[in-house]
């Protein structure tokens, strides 16, 4: 029997090169840390694609399309083309790299510019919290920035799996709640949110994916 999913969300992962975006995605989608010498942790060239189903409520699954973007400047033109069709994003910095934190606002402003006229929901992620002894960014600083920018904040580690599952769950649930409120809508020509596959026998979930007659976006 085919897997049931009520929505598909396209999420983008952005931030400076070497902050660990690819390792986070490997941990979330494959349940493992690829290791620093693995090609999986090499800087991304262009954009890589991952996917996974996430159950946010009993019997309600969201299909996540996850786009891992290159942090290097020479690939930014490729990255920008993916903003517009994303409903959510992980803004990742390395807590042991001050510069990556200082660039967060630049990434955010760029994303807001290219996502127009659609809405994108962000989660600020302080990665590599297993290296707390090498921390260059305090939790208080990161929490203040996230509050100023209207985002939630979480610290993660792909190496020991700290808060990896939680971070994807938080962002997915936030988007799902906004859809239920009518603040994010399925729209023709936009790939950010799509209705999912629901067998005819599952009437309760079927109702959840019917397009709204009104949209308050």
Curated annotation (Swiss-Prot):
Impact reported for residue 215 to A: Non-prenylatable mutant. Loss of localization to autolysosomes and impaired autophagic flux under autophagy-induced conditions
Residues of the signal peptide: none
Activity regulation as described: Regulated by guanine nucleotide exchange factors (GEFs) including c9Orf72, which promote the exchange of bound GDP for free GTP. Regulated by GTPase activating proteins (GAPs) which increase the GTP hydrolysis activity. Inhibited by GDP dissociation inhibitors (GDIs).
Assembly behavior: Interacts (GDP-bound) with C9orf72; C9orf72 acts as a GEF for RAB39A. Interacts (GTP-bound) with HOPS complex components VPS39 and VPS41, and STX17; interaction between HOPS components and RAB39A contributes to obtaining a functional HOPS complex that promotes membrane fusion driven by STX17-SNAP29-VAMP8. Interacts with BECN1. Probably associates with the PI3K (PI3KC3/PI3K-III/class III phosphatidylinositol 3-kinase) complex. Interacts with UACA. Interacts with isoform a of RASSF1. Does not interact with isoform c of RASSF1.
Comment field on protein domains: Switch I, switch II and the interswitch regions are characteristic of Rab GTPases and mediate the interactions with Rab downstream effectors. The switch regions undergo conformational changes upon nucleotide binding which drive interaction with specific sets of effector proteins, with most effectors only binding to GTP-bound Rab.
Origin species: Homo sapiens
Membrane topology field: Lipid-anchor
GO cellular component: autolysosome membrane; cytosol; Golgi membrane; lysosomal membrane; phagocytic vesicle; phagocytic vesicle membrane; plasma membrane
One Pfam family here: Ras
Protein name: Ras-related protein Rab-39A
Top-level taxon in the UniProt lineage: Eukaryota
GO molecular function, a single term: GTPase activity
EC number annotated for this UniProt entry: 3.6.5.2
Co-factor requirement: Mg(2+)
Task of the protein: The small GTPases Rab are key regulators of intracellular membrane trafficking, from the formation of transport vesicles to their fusion with membranes. Rabs cycle between an inactive GDP-bound form and an active GTP-bound form that is able to recruit to membranes different sets of downstream effectors directly responsible for vesicle formation, movement, tethering and fusion.
């Amino acid at each position: 029997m085919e897997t049931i999913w009520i929505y598909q969300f396209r999420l983008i992962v952005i931030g400076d090169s070497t902050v660990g975006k690819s390792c986070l995605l490997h941990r979330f989608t494959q349940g493992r840390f690829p290791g620093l010498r693995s090609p999986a942790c090499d800087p991304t060239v262009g954009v890589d694609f991952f996917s996974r189903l996430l159950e946010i409520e009993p019997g309600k699954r969201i299909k996540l399309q996850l786009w891992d973007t290159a942090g290097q400047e020479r690939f930014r033109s490729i990255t920008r083309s993916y903003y517009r069709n994303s409903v959510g994003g992980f803004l990742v910095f390395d807590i042991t790299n001050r510069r990556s934190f200082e660039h967060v606002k630049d990434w955010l402003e760029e994303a807001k510019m290219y996502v127009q006229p659609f809405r994108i929901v962000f989660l600020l992620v302080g990665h590599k919290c297993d290296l707390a002894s090498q921390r260059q960014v305090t939790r208080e600083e990161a929490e203040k920035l996230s509050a100023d920018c209207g985002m939630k904040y979480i610290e993660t580690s792909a190496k020991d799996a700290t808060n990896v599952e939680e971070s994807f769950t938080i962002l997915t649930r936030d988007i799902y709640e906004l859809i239920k409120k009518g603040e994010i809508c399925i729209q023709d020509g936009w790939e950010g949110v799509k209705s999912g596959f629901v067998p005819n026998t599952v009437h309760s979930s079927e109702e959840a994916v019917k397009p709204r007659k009104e949209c308050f976006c």
